[in-house]
Amino acid sequence: MFRATRCLRLPLRNSHINILRPTQTELIKTRSSALAPYEKVSPITAVGATPVGVGNGNYCYSTKTRQKHPLINTRNDLKKAQRVVVKLGSAVITREDECGLALGRLASIVEQVSELQQSGRQMLIVSSGAVAFGRQKLRQELVMSMSMRQTLRGPSGMTADKRACAASGMPGLMSLYEQLFQQYGITVAQVLLTKPDIDDDQRRKNLQATIESLLSLNIIPIVNANDAVAPDPKLNMHISDNDSLAARLSAEIEAELLIILSNVNGVYTGPPDLEGSRLLYTYVPSENSGVTFGANSKFGTGGMESKVTACVNALNNGVTTVITNGLAQDAITDAVAGKKIGTMFCNTKGYEGPPIEEVAEKCRDAGRQLAALSNKERGAMVRHLAALLVDKEKYIIEANQTDLANAKSAGLDPQLLNRLKMTPEKIQDLHAGLNTIADSAETLVGRVLKKVKISEGLFLEQVTVPIGSLMVIFESRPDCLPQVASLAMASGNALLLKGGKEAEESNKALHALVQEALGTHGFEMRDAVTLVRSREDVADLLQLKDLIDLIIPRGSSDLVRSMQEKSKGIPVLGHAEGVCHVYIDKDCDEQKAIQIVRDSKCDYPSACNAAETILIHKDLATAPFFDSLCSMFKAEGVKLHAGPKLAALLKFAPPPAESMSFEYGSLECTLEVVDNVEEAVAHIIRYGSGHTESIITENTNTAEHFLKHVDSACAFHNASTRFADGYRFGLGAEVGISTGRIHARGPVGVEGLLTTKWLLRGEGHLVEDFKNGKYSYLHENLNPSEVYRALDAAGELKKATA
């Protein structure tokens, strides 16, 4: 038995309150799976209600004054919101024909609200839709009342009074809500409001007490303006639309968060369909006065301007607000989880920095300044960065030690810890590598690849230029940051970097040195290499095809695949999987074969160029060589999986492979038997990932057949697959490995960060001159040095001296 000073019973027959209770409802129901994305909130503690026994196992609740909550100013803190108001716009829950509700969308919204309610939060819905629901019913009644002649004419011009539609639609709308929430064991209550309920102090207190009682009973109030008796909207903020109602109500019940669902993604700098309009992820009233609003939605009474006004009023009363697209999947739960969706209204304090679009734009602009420098000037910047790495070695290692300590306490895999660790030896290797890149920078940009004499006095050149703006995402390895930054600096590209969170302090320290190098020699280009901090920013950047030209993920196959799936119109340079093969031919040198297979599989098992499948000629599968091969694998601790043909051939075969196209990334591999080189090639084409394949044979004809017909980025003869690496190819620091078919393929060095453009120089030439015979086409290929030589990236050209 619980005791309390005061019991509060809900007036069930109030003309404005309807309690809709499922037949079997738990008072407070929690679901562990629903708590994962959010912060757990104790239902009773959060409400401030104490259960009091009233007999027969039933309870009523006493209410207490809720503690004053601090204003939420960052998305990370949104998950702490305990009392959440969700406003459903007409455009979200109404069908396109404005007649009836979008049932699938409404069911999804109910599911999300139920999930949050069951996680311990107090949810309240401000819902539109009664007019649309009633319009559908009244339209049917109008049709039934029409004469035959009117029916044949069609329904054009048939209208129903909005108040009548609201009166007719309210019962059906609430019945629908009841049925949907009943599937989750949740009780709902209808609260209809008119203007006096808000304006009159006593009625407003009664309203507040009623809602507090409903929330304390774990009931979701569904609130709407009583449009059946509503007067014409007023100019002042009362309840002229449901946005204002939601904002006012959120302030009255001291909600921490108001989510307004609309049919647009949030607040834009101008009308969303206007060219140049940009979505504002954060709206600070004191800093966003220049927003231009478009027309209202055809569905409801409140346009974006009314939403912004309502949100600002809510913010002034201590309620953080998010406007987001209710048509998007999981919009409500994503907003509460703090994901970067929609527009968040907050004060200057706690402001999360400039929008990522502005960051990307500044980076691109600084990159263009970088590209305008001479090759020599960019090379000097890279050399300065190399020197800084040595000079600031102690600073780098101290920051790295912080990351290592955090990673160890978090239980990071030892192999990943090794990648994360920065040592004096690694820094010396970086120093040497960056100086090599600086040397190559002097011939990179502006190099003439082709020179054609089109006609007398008309010359065409193809020259190398930077791609533009790059985004590189890498995991665990902080030494990747200065490598990629130096490649971008040398090639004149802007660069957005996102490293793994486990290397956060190391990346900050290294990025500071990169920025110092970019600010030397009288140049101020620090924004040309920008470090992106949050995962949400990466998701936003993947949509900016006008600001980013190439994405390069460096990490696991899951990372690469994720970038390829989420990128919207931006090319991704990389490979999703590294299913590499080694084919051992019947004419192989057996000792050489065992050594190559050992190196391919065991040298670095998690590398993308490690062998994952070993194909063996059928003649070797029953020879002593097979036992020697298996003994080597056993000594190296490699777990074997048998392909179907090998399993059928052996009496006691290894366990079967789950897939013939699988990247283990560890000391495991698949063994399979093939009849000949043709079958080996067919197997690789079917199951391979297009990365690297190797044949071991002393038969030159067999080797050439393999090299010609294997359709992968790299094909080797009598060599380990581990040679598929930019450094081993002599490309300098490696940008990545690509299995794509355009721009770059295989290991990609700094050349992969360049593209070309055509320069045509004439003397007033016209196409018409070639039609009337004044000029004729020569198309004579020239050695570029014979006529012109590109001296720098600024496009300055000079006649070559004899």
UniProtKB/Swiss-Prot annotation:
Chain sites annotated for binding ATP: 262-263, 301-307
Positions bound to substrate: 128, 227, 242
Region entry Glutamate 5-kinase, spans: 1-354
Covalent S-S links between cysteines: none
GO molecular function, one term: ATP binding
Gamma-glutamyl phosphate reductase, as annotated region: 355-802
Gene3D superfamilies: Acetylglutamate kinase-like (3.40.1160.10), Aldehyde Dehydrogenase, Chain A, domain 1 (3.40.605.10), Aldehyde Dehydrogenase, Chain A, domain 2 (3.40.309.10)
EC number: 2.7.2.11, 1.2.1.41
Top-level lineage group: Eukaryota
InterPro entries: AceGlu_kinase-like_sf, Ald_DH/histidinol_DH, Ald_DH_C, Ald_DH_N, Aldehyde_DH_dom, Asp/Glu/Uridylate_kinase, G-glutamylP_reductase_CS, G5K_ProBA
Pfam families to which the protein is assigned, alphabetical: AA_kinase (PF00696), Aldedh (PF00171)
Reactions listed under catalytic activity: L-glutamate + ATP = L-glutamyl 5-phosphate + ADP; L-glutamate 5-semialdehyde + phosphate + NADP(+) = L-glutamyl 5-phosphate + NADPH + H(+)
Signal peptide: none
UniProt record, GO biological process: L-proline biosynthetic process
Keywords: Amino-acid biosynthesis, ATP-binding, Kinase, Multifunctional enzyme, NADP, Nucleotide-binding, Oxidoreductase, Proline biosynthesis, Transferase
NCBIfam families reported in the protein's UniProt record: P5CS, PRK00197.1, proA, proB
The family this protein is said to belong to: In the N-terminal section; belongs to the glutamate 5-kinase family.
Protein name: Probable delta-1-pyrroline-5-carboxylate synthase
Species of the source: Caenorhabditis elegans
